[in-house]
Amino acid sequence: MSLKKVLTSAGAVATALTLVFAGTTPATAAKVPSKKAKAGDECARAGLSAKGRGAEGTDLRCMTMTTGTASGQLRWWYPDLKPLKNIDWVVPANPGGYSQTSTAISESLKKEGLLSTYTSTFKPGAGGTVGLGFFQEIKAKPESVLITGLAMAGGIPSNKSPLKLEASTPIAKVMREYQALAVPATSKYKTLAQFLADWKANPKLAISGGSLGSTDHQFIGLLAKAAGIDPKAMNFVVHSGGPEVIASLLSSATVAGTSGSAEFQAQLAAGKIRVLAVSSAKRLPGYSAKTLKEQNVDLVYGNWRGVMATADLAEADRLNMVKVFDAMRGTDTWKGYLKQYNWDDEWSAGKEFGSFLKVQLPLVAGVIKDLGLGG
């Protein structure tokens, strides 16, 4: 399967966000009937049941919320849900996109009364496989979770690692994020067309991104192919996180760089970088840059991130954790983070996330092969 076909498929676009970052849901929000209910939706009368509408076919009940931003309101909820006391994150990279996501999850859970405390352990290196290996050695710690995503899915075959992501326990795929292609504000490149013309003439232009096989690498490989450049011939300069990519741009160590769009927001607002294109189907709020498609590059691409628990997690604890994360999805705090970071609400919980991984991981392995890695 071709690089373009695989990544275009992998980057299918979720419904555009129209969510409002606010402390409470507007009073005019419609009550959701039981046959359409999701955890966190408003409901009409306490005690009503929504059979099979929860994660993995579990039931929801219309309940008066006692904590969080919806306190005092009627919401579809899990009657047997137990808030988590602690989450101990393993973050398989330096601070950047992964930790941004894990922090957004943790702060959402805390504010909504679903979590008491959380900690993070950073284990960067080898496309996320250092962190994955560390995580998969953890035993008898039900509070331990791993933040993962497309970067790790690519990092495993890129580094010829024997580790298998699916050996851990899938909890939830929580979002999809789009890429931005950026240059320093002082760059001569004002448009994507100018940059692509020079890149085609000189494929060795230094372009910064994440680790080998990462989301950034996959995206730049696809962009190269669209520009008529052999992805195996490009000069992709690896870094362990978004801040390092930004530093390489600001120091002119690289000509251009890519990362998740949220990574560049602060530097863009400060006027230190210029974004030439974003990889979403529609323009992103806060970015004046056009999409790739608007600039005659037929590419829509997005990175997903998700949460894994340890392989030995007891079934009762697994199902409760799945419910906690699924409940978080419907909260105003989490919806606010989706809006703030331009993330798409692309969600799958528990066994559904496991089914996604069974399809996704072989596809990503094919992408890595097209990049000349992992052979």
Task: State the predicted function of each range.
Residues 18-36:
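C-terminal region of N-terminal signal peptides and the immediate post-cleavage residues
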Residues 78-166, 212, 216, 228-256, ...:
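N-terminal (or domain-start) structured segment
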Residues 143-146, 162-180, 206-208, 293-298:
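A structural signal for short loop-to-beta-strand junctions that line the ligand-binding cleft
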Residues 208-289:
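Ligand-binding pocket segment of bilobal, Venus flytrap-like solute-binding proteins
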